[in-house]
Amino acid sequence: MIKLLYPEFWQKRNIIAYLLLPISLIYQFLGYLRASLARPIMLPAKVICVGNCSVGGTGKTQIVMYLAKLLKARNVSFVIVTKAYGSNLKSATTIHQGHTALEAGDEGVILAKYGAVIATKSIKEIVPLINELKPDTIIVDDFLQNPYFHKDFTIVSVDSQRLFGNGFLIPAGPLRQYPNKVLDAADLIFLVSSHQDKIPNILTPYVNKLINAQIVPANNIDKTKNYFAFSGIGNPERFFATLKNYGLNITGYKIFPDHYNYLQADLENLYSLAKEHNATLVTTRKDHVKFNDLNNNIVCLDVELSINNPDLLNEKIFKKAQIFN
């Protein structure tokens, strides 16, 4: 898998974005061809699909965690299906908490705390495992653009700062799909890390299905120390902003590509940088799980989702067509 940082021209158009537009048109055509030829299968349970329109972190994992806790509280049996990013998986596998990030992907390891998880690179491969587990509901993480399975309920996650970037498709921009059609079809839209009262203009037509959400710290960290922060996630800027908003003194940063698999040399370099800054290393849970027993001196900031209108979420999920009754 190609691992890229989020380039500046994905947010603000420049000559590079325009030069890449012909490739974006090819990407668009291939996506259309794929969707038109697909024959979606019906999975043997009701499906909640969580995804986004663009590349980069938009809070999908935290939404999936929130949904898992919500369904568990309602005694609804469920399985989480996640892409095996950064793993060496060859086929769909049921994940347990003993798996490493290399075996299951960073998201698979994290989500295994919340319920049964299947990590896969192909939706069709999960059917035998779903038949074994027999859940009432399947929470599918990050397969929104996959046309090969039926979705009963879709949630689109939107980052409140990046929104839809420069409006171009990959690689000229960050978009996997143009947003209007996706937002029209969505059952719910999460505007993540939104601390603003004003709704972005592009989302005002969807206010009746819009949920404002924040990514907030879920554990206590010593605020008297200095910290050197690093991450290899889709939206590192949001992580760094969360650290500052939490009140930590951040003396330096280092950004790695999304789903980066750290080497021993990376760890040694990070410890050296932290020593230069008289600081302790701090990172995300997605990064932390990749260090196994080597991470004893690295502080991890756990985060969770906080939403302003949970009643809307409950109403939409549990009442729409009574799909979970």
Curated annotation (Swiss-Prot):
SUPFAM superfamilies: P-loop containing nucleoside triphosphate hydrolases. GO terms for cellular component: plasma membrane. One of its GO terms (biological process) is lipid A biosynthetic process. ATP binds at residues 54-61. It holds the Pfam family LpxK. The keyword Transferase applies. It catalyses: a lipid A disaccharide + ATP = a lipid IVA + ADP + H(+). Its EC number is 2.7.1.130. PANTHER family: TETRAACYLDISACCHARIDE 4'-KINASE, TETRAACYLDISACCHARIDE 4'-KINASE, MITOCHONDRIAL-RELATED. Transfers the gamma-phosphate of ATP to the 4'-position of a tetraacyldisaccharide 1-phosphate intermediate (termed DS-1-P) to form tetraacyldisaccharide 1,4'-bis-phosphate (lipid IVA). This is Tetraacyldisaccharide 4'-kinase. It comes from Rickettsia montanensis. The gene is lpxK.
